Amino acid sequence: MRKYWKNIMADFTFAHREEGFDEHIEFSIRGYRNLLDDIVNYSRYFVEDNTNVIDIGCSTGKVTLKMLDSNKDHCKDARYVGVEIAEGFFDDLDKRQKEIKKQFPWANIEFIKDDICNYKFENCSLVTSVFTLQFMPKRHREKVIQNIYDGLVTGGAFIFAEKTIAQNSLIQDMITFNYYDYKRQNFECKDIMDKEKTLRHMMKPNTWKEIQSMIYDA
């Protein structure tokens, strides 16, 4: 295991890009890179000029930048906003924004520190969220999804990915231990368990039925 990942495993929420956060997540979540690629590809169907594209929990701004790059030829006047609440990412995000301005001087993009429970969604052609809602208090999730839905333009979309828990305990055990086997390819057992302990009070996944219910009610 790479040495700098030990610190990230201990406090991954506040890890910096220079310390390998993006790479760490790719090695932690099977298919993560493909997931991001799919989201970026799907964005081409929804991003429109003179609308907002919001990336919730943008961390290092990777997806925000990829969507900007992917849509630059046909939607140059879209506005991109990366919303992040973790203070530890903002040194990286400041650097990311400067890099973007050099590469795309015309780009309308910003990264802001905000709690999405309080964020006002409006005129959005696309809102994305990658493993973010699961870290929010459950009592706020339905309201946030409703706010997102209310802020979409006609034909707009909310694309999100979430960790879920199975309703069947045997299936949940199968998924969990298979996931541990996968993570042991890149991380030490103690580091995996330490991270799991850290996440206990932070991450509260829903079942798929609960997520469906929140979506249908919005």
Where are these regions (language model features)?
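Class I SAM-dependent methyltransferase Rossmann-like catalytic core
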Residues: 7-11, 15-35
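Conserved alpha-helix/loop element of class I SAM-dependent methyltransferases that forms part
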Residues: 31-49
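Class I SAM-dependent methyltransferase SAM/SAH-binding core
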Residues: 54, 59-117
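A short glycine-rich, Lys/Arg-flanked "PGG" loop and its adjoining helix->strand segment in the class I
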Residues: 142-154
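Conserved beta-strand signature within the Rossmann-like core of class I S-adenosyl-L-methionine
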Residues: 155-163
